[in-house]
Amino acid sequence: MIPFEGDALALAPRLIGVMLLVDGVGGLIVETEAYRRDDPASHSFTGPTPRNAAMFGRPFHAYVYRSYGLHWCFNIVAEDHGAVLIRALAPLVGLERMAARRGGPAFLCAGPGRLTQALAITGALDGAPLDLPPFDWREREGVPDIVTGPRIGISKAVSEPWRFGLRGSPFLSRRFP
C-alpha cells in the first residue's frame, strides 16, 4: 500500500519513486514540493477560495490550478489542508502520446507545466479522487536516495528545504544546489 497519509511535508518525500499513470500514461515521480497550511507560500495559507477549494477537501484528491494563467499544476491534497506539487516524472509509459501532447520528446515531464501537458491533466480533474481512474499508482521499489533543497518559483518562505528529488535523476525540472 502506498502511504498517502500525513501532512504535505511527510508525504512529499514518500512520493519520490512512486509510479503515477494517468489514463495509462506516466512514469516515476522524481521531484515534489511540499506546501503546508501554515506556509506563507501555500495557496491554503489565507483560507478557502474557489481556486483552492480542493485543498480544503479530503486528502488524496487532486488540486489542479493554473500557474500564471498559462500552465496547469498538479498537486496531491495532503492532511491539514496542505498539498504536494508533483514537479517532475521520469517518463516511462506512453512516451509517444506524451511527445504528441508536448510537441516533441524534449523535457517531456520536467516541470509542473510540462508534466500536466504530457499527462493531459487539466482543471477538469481538480478535486478528483486519486484512487479512481484515470489515476493509477504503483508502489516504489526500494528506498530512493532523496535530495532536498529550496522550492522553485515562489516569493515567500523561499529558504524552506521543502523540495524533494531523486538524487542524480536526469528528469528533474532543475538541479539541486
What are these regions (language model features)?
Residues 1-177:
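Conserved, well-structured core segments that form or line functional sites
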